[in-house]
């Protein structure tokens, strides 16, 4: 009697099913890791195509993109260290404006570019340390602390600028008669500033990924209780994070002066919110932890800058261009967050 050979789909055992789910999760994780880079490339391509089709100057618009991405890049790369430990700070934009106002004032009094740079960085570090003390030493709620300090720093910047000149603090760096004009031609060059941003991002990436302090930051952000039980002191890590953030903010303030020459109360407007969007566009979760990435702010900053300038060129003849741009940015923000969340396995610890 002949027997029929048939293939029967046997149900997977428990271990096989878990292995299959694990492989799917790892594949999804790898794919989502490339979403920010792919998004940046696509937005850059759309930007160039739009500029060419509209007949606008590509070089000029590209320099605008770099200027926008550079300030946000310095600020957000430094802020990555704060978000990595599970904290956040909404006062960074106001912090930058205060230090820029102080730096411009000191330059007008002393005529020293190096002293202006030092004042910008030191002022930002001190203000960041103040936030760190309020957040870690006095155990104030982070949300309350950042809202309060944002108001304080905004009022302080207005006070400094209005006491010098109600229209803003003009450093006159771009004037040919200024002795520092030769240095301004270098420091104010957009490609030199981009090189400085790349150098800063690489340095932060090294600290974040290859140094013991960076790994501890991710540990604290992922599970602060376990980190404390293993002997990691969160206070020292928090202070370190806010200091690095202060350096990034100070550099952003210095190059803001180099770009704008003068500082007013509207300088750096919206940079704080752009920082948050850039970090998310770069593929990093605001909650921090093991998924934190030092390069996220750099990638996200350029994504956002390409998007902004692409929409600006596309809707240059539209009266509702600004509103449409904000709506598109919000939709993309939610889309990126959703795609990134697909790779999370909430029932297991992150590695």
Language-model regions, residue ranges each:
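Cytosolic-side transmembrane-helix boundaries in multi-pass membrane proteins
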Residues: 1-46, 222-236, 307-351
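Inter-helical junctions in multi-pass inner-membrane proteins, predominant
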Residues: 53-64, 158, 162-164, 208, ...
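Hydrophobic alpha-helical segments embedded in the membrane of multi-pass proteins
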Residues: 68-78, 94-98, 125-129, 148, ...
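Alpha-helical transmembrane segments within multi-pass membrane transporters and channels
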Residues: 111-151, 300
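Helix-loop-helix "hairpin" substructures at the membrane interface of multi-pass membrane proteins
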Residues: 112, 117, 127-131, 185-264
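Transmembrane alpha-helical segments in multi-pass inner-membrane proteins
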Residues: 260-330
């Amino acid at each position: 009697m002949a027997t029929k050979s048939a293939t029967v789909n046997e149900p997977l055992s428990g271990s096989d099913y878990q292995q299959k789910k694990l492989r799917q999760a790892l594949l999804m994780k790898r794919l989502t890791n490339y979403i920010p880079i792919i998004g940046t490339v696509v937005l850059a391509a759309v930007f160039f195509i739009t500029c060419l089709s509209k007949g606008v100057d590509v070089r000029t618009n590209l320099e605008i993109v770099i200027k926008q991405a550079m300030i946000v890049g310095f600020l957000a790369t430094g802020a990555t260290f704060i978000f990595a430990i599970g904290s956040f700070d909404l006062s960074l934009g106001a912090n930058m404006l205060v230090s820029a106002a102080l730096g411009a004032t000191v330059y007008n009094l002393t005529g020293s570019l190096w002293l202006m740079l030092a004042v910008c960085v030191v002022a930002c570090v001190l203000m960041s340390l103040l936030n760190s003390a309020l957040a870690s030493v006095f155990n104030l709620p982070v949300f309350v602390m950042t809202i309060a300090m944002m108001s304080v720093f905004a009022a302080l910047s207005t006070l400094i600028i209005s006491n010098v000149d109600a229209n803003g603090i003009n450093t006159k760096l771009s004037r040919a008669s200024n002795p520092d004009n030769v240095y301004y031609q270098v420091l104010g060059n957009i490609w030199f500033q981009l090189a400085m941003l790349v150098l800063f991002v690489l340095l932060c990436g090294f600290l974040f990924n290859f140094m013991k302090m960076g790994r501890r930051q991710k540990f604290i952000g992922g599970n602060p209780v376990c980190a404390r039980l293993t002997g990691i002191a969160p206070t020292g890590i928090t202070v370190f994070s806010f200091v690095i953030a202060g350096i990034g903010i100070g550099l952003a303030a210095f190059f803001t002066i180099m770009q704008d020459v003068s500082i007013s109360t509207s300088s750096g407007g919206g940079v704080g919110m752009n920082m948050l969007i850039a970090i998310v566009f770069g593929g990093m979760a605001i909650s921090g932890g093991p998924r934190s990435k030092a390069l996220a702010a750099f990638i996200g900053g350029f994504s956002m800058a390409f998007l902004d300038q692409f929409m600006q060129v596309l809707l240059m003849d539209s009266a509702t261009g600004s509103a449409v741009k904000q709506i598109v940015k919000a939709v993309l923000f939610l889309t990126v967050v959703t795609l990134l969340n697909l790779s999370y396995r909430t029932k297991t610890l992150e590695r």
